[in-house]
C-alpha cells in the first residue's frame, strides 16, 4: 500500500465517520452486489450462430472499431481482460446466440451441452451466469413478431426456443450454485397505426404462460420479463409494453426487468423501482444510457446511474434486485466500454453505500427539506474516491485510469491481429 493511498484512506475514514458512515462496512456491502456484465458488448450482438447476419429487432450497434471477438475463445479472453480491471464480484449475461456447436443448431433445439464451454469458464473464474433467449436476428422474426405471432407454427417455434432457454438457464444455476436470471425480451410490434392491439397481447400472454409452465427450481433459475416503448421499425405499437409486463410479472410473480433505455426519454427507471417492488418479488435492472432513444451508450457515472444505485441501497434491496448492464458501442474499444460502464456502476453503488441515509431520512420525516437538500449536496464532496481506490487496491485492480494502459497493450498485442 502506498503511503499516499494509505493517508487518503485514513482521512476518508475519518471524514465519513464524522457523518456516521463506517467505510469498512460499506466495502463489505459492496462485495454483496455483483454486476452482471453483458457478453454482447464484445462482438456488437453478432453471436456465433450467424456472425455475418444483420442485427434485427429494432436495435442497432453503431461503429466499426477493429478487433471485435469472432468466436467463444476470443470473447472469453476479452472478457477476462476486462474483468481483471474491474474490482469486486461480477457475473456474465449470455444470449442464446452465443452457443457453441460444430454443427448448426436450431434455436428451438438448444441444449445445455451447447453452453458447456461457458459453464466451465465461469467455474474457473468464479462467476455466475445469466441467460436470455434470442428472439431476433432470425428468419422467423423477420416480419417483426415472435411470441405474439399470428402464425401458430412460428409462435410455437419461439415458445419452444424460450422453453429450451429456461432449461439452459437452470443448468447454469445448478452447475454454478447461484441462480441464473433469464430475461425474456421480444421485439414484437408494428411500424404504423395498428388496428388490433389486443389480439397480439392475448397471444403473448398465452405464449408466456406456456413458456413458464415447466416448474424449475428457483435456486437455479429465475424468470424475468422486459418491456420496451418502441424499436426501430416498431415505432407505433409494441406488444410487450410496460403495462403488459407489469401486469404479467405481478399476476405470475415473475421478476420484472426495467431497462434504462426502454421508456420515454422523460422517464427514469430509478423512479420505478420502489413502485414495482410493491408488486413483484424481484427486479432485474438493465442499466444503460439512452441518448434521445434506446441507443445503449456506455454507462456513465451520471445522475440516473447514481439514482438507480441509491434506490437499491436506501431500500435494502440487495436480495431482490439483480443488476445487469445493457449497452453496446462499436465505435470505441469494446474492452474499454465494458470497463468504463461496469466500473461506473460499481462506483455509483459505493457512493450510495457511503450516503448518510439515516440522517437524511430523519430530516425528511421532520419536514426539514432545506437541510435534506444541503446534506445531499454536501455529501457529494466527501472523499469517496479514496474509498474507491482502496477497494480497487484490495481487489488487485487499477484504481484510476491506469487500466487504460492494460487495454492499449491488449489491443496492440491481441485485438490488432484480428481480421
UniProtKB/Swiss-Prot annotation:
Biological pathway: Carbohydrate degradation; L-rhamnose degradation; glycerone phosphate from L-rhamnose: step 1/3
Subunit note: Homotetramer.
GO biological process: L-lyxose metabolic process; rhamnose catabolic process
Any Pfam family: RhaA
Subcellular location: Cytoplasm
Enzyme class, first EC level, given as a word: isomerase
Residues bound to Mn(2+): 262, 294, 296
InterPro entries, alphabetized: L-rhamnose_isomerase, Rhamnose_isomerase, Xyl_isomerase-like_sf
Name of the protein described by the UniProt record: L-rhamnose isomerase
Bound cofactor: record note: Binds 1 Mn(2+) ion per subunit.
Catalytic reaction equation(s): L-rhamnopyranose = L-rhamnulose
Database matches in SUPFAM superfamilies: Xylose isomerase-like
GO molecular function, one term: manganese ion binding
Principal location class: cytoplasm
Keyword terms of this UniProt record: Cytoplasm, Isomerase, Manganese, Metal-binding, Rhamnose metabolism
Entry keyword Repressor: no
Name of the gene: rhaA
Family: Belongs to the rhamnose isomerase family.
Enzyme Commission number, as recorded: 5.3.1.14
Alphabetical list of Gene3D superfamilies matching this protein: Divalent-metal-dependent TIM barrel enzymes
Keyword Lyase appears in the UniProt entry: no
Required cofactor(s): Mn(2+)
Task of the protein: Catalyzes the interconversion of L-rhamnose and L-rhamnulose.
One GO CC term on file: cytoplasm
Amino acid at each position: 500500500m502506498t503511503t499516499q493511498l494509505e493517508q487518503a484512506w485514513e482521512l476518508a475514514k475519518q471524514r465519513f465517520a464524522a457523518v456516521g458512515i463506517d467505510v469498512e462496512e460499506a466495502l463489505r456491502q459492496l462485495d454483496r452486489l455483483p454486476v452482471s456484465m453483458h457478453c454482447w458488448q464484445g462482438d456488437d450482438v453478432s453471436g456465433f450462430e450467424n456472425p455475418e447476419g444483420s442485427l434485427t429487432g429494432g436495435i442497432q450497434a453503431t461503429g466499426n472499431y477493429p478487433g471485435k471477438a469472432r468466436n467463444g475463445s476470443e470473447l472469453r479472453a476479452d472478457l477476462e481482460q476486462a474483468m481483471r480491471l474491474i474490482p469486486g464480484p461480477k457475473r456474465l449475461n449470455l444470449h442464446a446466440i452465443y452457443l457453441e456447436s460444430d454443427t448448426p443448431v436450431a434455436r428451438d433445439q438448444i441444449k445445455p451441452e451447447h453452453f458447456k464451454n461457458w459453464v466451465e469458464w465461469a467455474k474457473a473464474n468464479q462467476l455466475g451466469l445469466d441467460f436470455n433467449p434470442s428472439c431476433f436476428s432470425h428468419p422467423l422474426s423477420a416480419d417483426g413478431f415472435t411470441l405474439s405471432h399470428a402464425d401458430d407454427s412460428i409462435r410455437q417455434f419461439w415458445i419452444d426456443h424460450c422453453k429450451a432457454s429456461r432449461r439452459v438457464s437452470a443448468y447454469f444455476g445448478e452447475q454454478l450454485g447461484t441462480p441464473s436470471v433469464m430475461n425474456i425480451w421480444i421485439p414484437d410490434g408494428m411500424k404504423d397505426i395498428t388496428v388490433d392491439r389486443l389480439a397480439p397481447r392475448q397471444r403473448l400472454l398465452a405464449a408466456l404462460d406456456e413458456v413458464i409452465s415447466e416448474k424449475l427450481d428457483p435456486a437455479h433459475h429465475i424468470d424475468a420479463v422486459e418491456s420496451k416503448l418502441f424499436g426501430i421499425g416498431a415505432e407505433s405499437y409494441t406488444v410487450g409494453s410496460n403495462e403488459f409486463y407489469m401486469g404479467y410479472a405481478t399476476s405470475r410473480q415473475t421478476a420484472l426487468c426495467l431497462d434504462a433505455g426502454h421508456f420515454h426519454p422523460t422517464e427514469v427507471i430509478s423512479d420505478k423501482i420502489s413502485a414495482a417492488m410493491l408488486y413483484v418479488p424481484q427486479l432485474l435492472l438493465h442499466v444503460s444510457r439512452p441518448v434521445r432513444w434506446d441507443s445503449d451508450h456506455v454507462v456513465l457515472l451520471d445522475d440516473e446511474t447514481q439514482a438507480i444505485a441509491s434506490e437499491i441501497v436506501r431500500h435494502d434491496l440487495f436480495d431482490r434486485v439483480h443488476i445487469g448492464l445493457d449497452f453496446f458501442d462499436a465505435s470505441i474499444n469494446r474492452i474499454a466500454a465494458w470497463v468504463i460502464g461496469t466500473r461506473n456502476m460499481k462506483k455509483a453503488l459505493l457512493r450510495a453505500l457511503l450516503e448518510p441515509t439515516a440522517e437524511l431520512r430523519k430530516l425528511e420525516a421532520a419536514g426539514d427539506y432545506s437541510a435534506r437538500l444541503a446534506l445531499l449536496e454536501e455529501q457529494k464532496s466527501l472523499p469517496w474516491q479514496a474509498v474507491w481506490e482502496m477497494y480497487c487496491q484490495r481487489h488487485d485492480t487499477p484504481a484510476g485510469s491506469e487500466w487504460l494502459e492494460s487495454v492499449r497493450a491488449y489491443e496492440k498485442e491481441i485485438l490488432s491481429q484480428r481480421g
